[in-house]
Regions:
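Auxiliary Fe-S-binding modules of radical SAM enzymes
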Residues: 1-60, 256-363
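N-terminal [4Fe-4S]-dependent radical SAM core
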Residues: 19-118, 133-137
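Short N-terminal secondary-structure initiator segments
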Residues: 57-76, 166-185, 206-208, 212, ...
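Cysteine-centered iron-sulfur cluster-binding motifs in ferredoxin-type domains/subunits
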Residues: 116-129, 144, 175
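Short loop/turn segments at strand-loop or loop-helix junctions that form parts
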Residues: 118-120, 128-132, 230-236
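Short, conserved acidic/polar surface loops in the N-terminal third of protein domains
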Residues: 127-130, 138-142, 181-183, 210-212
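Conserved alpha-helical substructure of the radical SAM core
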Residues: 133-169
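Conserved AdoMet/S-adenosylmethionine-binding subsite of the radical SAM
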Residues: 155-168, 173-303
Length: 363
């Protein structure tokens, strides 16, 4: 098992060079495959993601979309398909963007299509990752350096080329906070464009580099048109290490990073892959909820659990990591969802709190 902090230090000079940032190539990697109508490349290096894509949801009015009836799991989740287990697969970023920009009068469909920028370089080696390993490794054959201005020009061209609204720019990876200067520079460019919302993914591992630009980064992260999602890799240190390949001792660093975001008044959300090893699913989830509550009593209500699909790259990663004795758990993901939404959260929160969208939950 490796040290992700040292790995980040090695990757940083490759991810940022001469004022330009290393962006992953999408074309030819399998990520442009339009399997679920939600992944398609706009160009060689940039792609879109749709979050609300069911016809019956796209036809709803804004008021209907904000109904708590869309939250949680379907009835009888353990007998449903994994793909259909959640009533609304993703709340974020469309709901969080609409709420932050316009309150519950905002239409999530206006923030449904995200122009996605994928930085190359990750200090984890997750066994379920949706990104091909070569794309995450700063490989010059699968990446290219861009200035922030060049990237924003692509975004503006995409806005011209499509009829539906494109108001979200999503920064993913790789791990963005290894080069937090990218977030700062990108926001400064997007600030000139009215109505734009910036969504930032992070694996909560790079506080060292965040703190190096604390003043500028903190100023960006507290803005109303910025949201951050921190992806926790597992509910305990043992599972964290199996998932990421990192040493168990770095499990706690995720909570330190989340606390830093909260201290900086960031609009923070949490992703949690539905991957739990062994038979103690409820016990592990209960312990994880308590760890989040130690940071903020309402933070578990801002968790969006992720379904792990076997996308082409994910399937490759699963096969590779299985050979390294790090297979994804055999535990049925539906059981993890059921434990989180139907058994553990109701122990700690009222029906009123459970009926709120993540973005409505105060921190």
């Amino acid at each position: 098992m490796f040290d992700p902090v040292k790995r980040a230090d090695m990757l940083r000079p490759l991810m940022l060079k001469n004022g330009k940032f290393l962006i992953s190539r999408i074309a030819g990697t399998g990520e442009e495959v339009k399997e679920d109508e939600d992944r398609i490349a706009y160009s060689t290096y940039f792609k879109f993601k749709w979050y609300i894509d069911l016809p019956e949801q796209l036809s709803l009015s804004p008021a209907e979309l904000w109904s708590p009836n869309l939250l949680g799991l379907v009835d009888n989740p353990l007998s449903s398909s994994l793909r259909d287990i959640k009533k609304l697969e993703f709340q974020n970023p469309p709901f969080s963007a609409a709420f932050r920009m316009k309150g519950k009068h905002g239409d999530p469909k206006d923030y449904n299509r995200a122009f996605t920028i994928q930085l190359s370089g990750c200090n984890y080696n997750c066994n379920y990752c949706f990104v091909p390993p070569e794309t995450n490794a700063c490989n010059p054959n699968f990446s290219k350096y861009f200035s922030v201005k060049e990237i924003v020009d692509y975004f503006l061209k995409a806005r011209e080329d499509f009829n539906e609204p494109i108001n979200v720019v999503r920064v993913t990876g790789g791990e963005n906070m290894i080069v937090p200067e990218f977030v700062i520079e990108l926001y400064n460019e997007l600030e000139k464009i009215d109505g734009t919302y910036l969504w930032i993914d992070t694996n909560l591992s790079a506080t060292k580099h965040m703190e190096n630009v604390e003043n500028e980064l903190k100023d960006v992260l507290k803005r109303r048109n910025v949201g951050v999602t921190g992806c926790f890799k597992g509910t305990c240190k043992e599972d964290f290490s199996l998932i990421t390949g990192a040493q168990q001792s770095f499990f706690d660093d995720q909570f330190k990073a989340a606390k830093l975001f909260l201290d900086w008044k960031t609009d923070l959300y949490v992703y949690l892959p539905a991957l739990v090893y062994g038979n103690s699913v409820e016990q592990k989830i209960d312990g994880f909820v308590n760890m989040l509550q130690a940071l903020n009593k309402n933070l578990p209500l801002r968790v969006e659990m992720l379904i792990i699909h076997e996308y082409p790259a994910a399937k490759r990663n699963m096969e590779l990591k299985s050979k390294e004795k790090r297979p994804i758990p055999l535990t049925d993901q539906r059981k993890v969802f059921d434990s989180w939404y139907n058994k553990i959260l109701p122990k700690y929160y009222s029906k009123e709190m459970l009926s709120k969208f993540c973005c409505e939950v105060p921190l």
